[in-house]
Amino acid sequence: GKEIQEVKDGEVGEICVAGPTVTEEYYRMPGATFDSKFRYDSKIYHRMGDLGYFDANLTLRFLGRKAERINTAQGPLETERCEAIVNTVDGVRRSALIGLGDKDPVEPCVVIEPERGFRNRTAINEIEKEVLDRLKVRLPHFEITQMRTESSLPVDARHNAKIHRLD
């Protein structure tokens, strides 16, 4: 089977859950069961596919989907670590962290979708400057300098929120 390693508080790991609603297997899907279910301390756990860590107050902090984390020359960078900063900038409707390049390490790039009323060149220039300034302060280790602007980002039709960045 798979090796399971518990992480220490403050370390990033995959969020796994156990409890009465966690099923032992997927119906007629042994591959999916093998990939996402495991037994630990006599409980069945489900791998959520999300990354997170427990902070000093033992609050679980969500960092994004495991499949969407990018590996940069400075180390792994999770989507929410970056997007949570970018999305607080006035004029940003939503953002997506992507990696530029065909193989690891990739160069981090922030794609923004501006709010209506912020789609002219002057506003976009101001937004991009503010985004890069905030990232330089909050995530200096990653040296994020690449940005793109799109009129809209592709989202999941059911939620209108989950960004399709792997397409």
Regions found by a protein language model. Name each.
Residues 22, 36-37, 59-87, 111-122, ...:
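Adenylate-forming
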Residues 6-9, 76-79, 121, 125, ...:
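Short, solvent-exposed loop/helix junctions and linker helices
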Residues 96-101, 110, 132-167:
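Conserved C-terminal "lid"/linker of ANL adenylate-forming enzymes
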Residues 12, 43, 57, 67, ...:
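Active-site lining segments that contact anionic ligands and/or coordinate catalytic metals
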Residues 59-63, 68-69, 79, 94, ...:
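AMP-dependent adenylate-forming
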Residues 2-73:
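Conserved ATP-binding/catalytic segment of the ANL
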Residues 17-19, 112-114, 159:
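Flexible glycine-/small-residue-rich
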